[in-house]
Amino acid sequence: MPVDLDNSSTVSGEASVSISSTGNQNPLPNSTGKKKRNLPGMPDPESEVIALSPKTLLATNRFVCEICNKGFQRDQNLQLHRRGHNLPWKLRQKSNKEVKKKVYVCPEVSCVHHDPSRALGDLTGIKKHFCRKHGEKKWKCDKCSKKYAVQSDWKAHSKICGTKEYKCDCGTLFSRRDSFITHRAFCDALAEENARSHHSQSKKQNPEILTRKNPVPNPVPAPVDTESAKIKSSSTLTIKQSESPKTPPEIVQEAPKPTSLNVVTSNGVFAGLFESSSASPSIYTTSSSSKSLFASSSSIEPISLGLSTSHGSSFLGSNRFHAQPAMSATALLQKAAQMGAASSGGSLLHGLGIVSSTSTSIDAIVPHGLGLGLPCGGESSSGLKELMMGNSSVFGPKQTTLDFLGLGRAVGNGNGPSNGLSTLVGGGTGIDMATTFGSGEFSGKDISRRKS
């Protein structure tokens, strides 16, 4: 019995020595100066290098109890377990000679830590290194399906998985924000590069897209020659006019914007004097087969002398044209006076340069005096000339109050001068003069009818 006590005391003494020796292996760092920590895999050159096989490293229970077959990772734990079975147990004691520090190398030949100069100084560290880098990943996370080769890593991940995470568009999960930002920048750059390559490929495969975006402009049509256009339109109108039996050949002339002068009478004094054509307002025909009524030089501004009746018929015999290009009023009257004086016909139409192609006389077309009761015989044209020059006896001292020209003055009362038709036409263009013949000397019965 006392032997047992001595044995127990001896065992306790060995345990104390072992604990003290292990405590001396990790001395406290000096407070005065920090000791630089050795980099991983850079052990002390004097350390003992130990190479273990993969089976030994992966073994969970290296030390097994022979009574209950319970395994332990450390021999010290097994010795303490033996005390429960009342078996002899022995703890390592500190020897007098110094024990060298042990380092462990990785059993994988291709690993950098297989070199003794890069050996790891901890048995647990070398085990975890071998499992992480070269072992099988046995533990899997239930939330993110991530696998781990070390059980401790799996447990640490399971505690924080799903609590705070950053998910990229590509599906990768990150628990740290800095890692997520770095990955996101790389992922965005990669996506942009892929988009550019895809766009370039689509352009090569579909060249029609470029033609749709940049259509070829239509060629500008060549300018049309105005002279040829005039000739073509003139020939067309000539053909159209030739189809009508009443319309003689025409002379086409373009003129500036005309100004109309309308004289309204009660019975159509000059209605039917000219025949209207179906051409545009700038193109017209006359009753003469050789020359136009209003043919003049381009330097004279044209004017249209439109004398219309109260029934709405125009001077040219059509309501479709309200203005016809012609000479100015002053030039028209001067020409009429000159040609009327030199002509033997003595009519207004002959004075204006209109010569009928038929044998019908001027008296048959327009009655004597133009229906105004004026002497206009074939012997002389003094009556009409006087009317045109303003010296006719119509404006003489006759007892009538008829406002013949609609100018607000009494004609024939002798109170003021009158200039006749020359004053009327020479006064300007665009004037409508209403002449009322219902009473007095000039009755509507004296006005001749239009040509049948």
Swiss-Prot record:
What does the activity regulation annotation say?
A: Transcription activation is repressed by gibberellic acid GA(3) in the presence of TPR4.
Instruction: Summarize tissue expression.
Output: Observed in vegetative tissues. Mainly expressed in hypocotyls, petioles, shoot apices, root tips, and trichomes, and, at low levels, in leaves, stems and flowers.
**Which stretches does the record call C2H2-type zinc fingers?**
63-85, 104-134, 139-162
Which positions carry Phosphoserine?
Answer: S53
Q: Where is this region: Disordered?
A: 1-47, 196-254
User: What ranges does the record give for the region SHR-binding, renumbered to this chain?
Assistant: 176-188
Q: Does the keyword Flavoprotein apply?
A: no
One biological process term in Gene Ontology: regulation of DNA-templated transcription
The UniProt disruption phenotype note reads: Plants lacking both ENY/IDD1 and GAF1/IDD2 have a decreased responsiveness to gibberellic acid (GA).
According to its UniProt record, where is this protein mainly located? Answer: nucleus
The UniProt annotation places Zn(2+) 2 binding at C168, C170, H183, C187
What Gene3D superfamilies is this protein classified in? Classic Zinc Finger
A GO MF annotation of the entry reads: DNA binding
Sum up the protein's function in the record's words: Transcription factor that acts as a positive regulator of gibberellin (GA) action, homeostasis and signaling. GA converts the GAF1 complex from transcriptional activator to repressor via the degradation of DELLA proteins.
What is the protein named? Zinc finger protein GAI-ASSOCIATED FACTOR 1
- Species of the source: Arabidopsis thaliana (Mouse-ear cress)
